[in-house]
Amino acid sequence: MAVRELKNFVNGQQVAASSGETSDVINPANAETYAKAAVSNASDVDSAYKAAQKAFEEWSQTTPSERQLALFRIADALEARAEEAADIESENTGKPRSTLVEYEIMPSIDQIRFFAGAAKNLEGRATA
């Protein structure tokens, strides 16, 4: 199996850590290295923070209906790739793949859809 390279996801782009440093990611079920992940430093965190701050400013201007639609699209995309998500999660956690779709992936999709419905109704209000 080829060892994958996992980069940081910043501002919609996959980017290596500025230091170029990586760390092995090991499947706990078989102790095999399946990926190398970027090891981020303060500069990388600052870049990610700035990108997230900008994205939040844009996201906060979306309507509840737009937010709902975005969450439904995320749920649909995850559902379409549920088997792939289960493979990745099994590799990452060592959990049996056979249980992941039914007991973790599909309930996660249900939660996203639940909160998509709530997004349209909350309209920025909060209760204590």
Model-derived regions, located:
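Terminal low-complexity tails and localization/encapsulation signals of metabolic enzymes
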Residues: 1-36, 69, 73, 122-128
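Glycine-rich loop-to-alpha-helix module at the N-terminal edge of alpha/beta enzyme cores
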Residues: 32-122
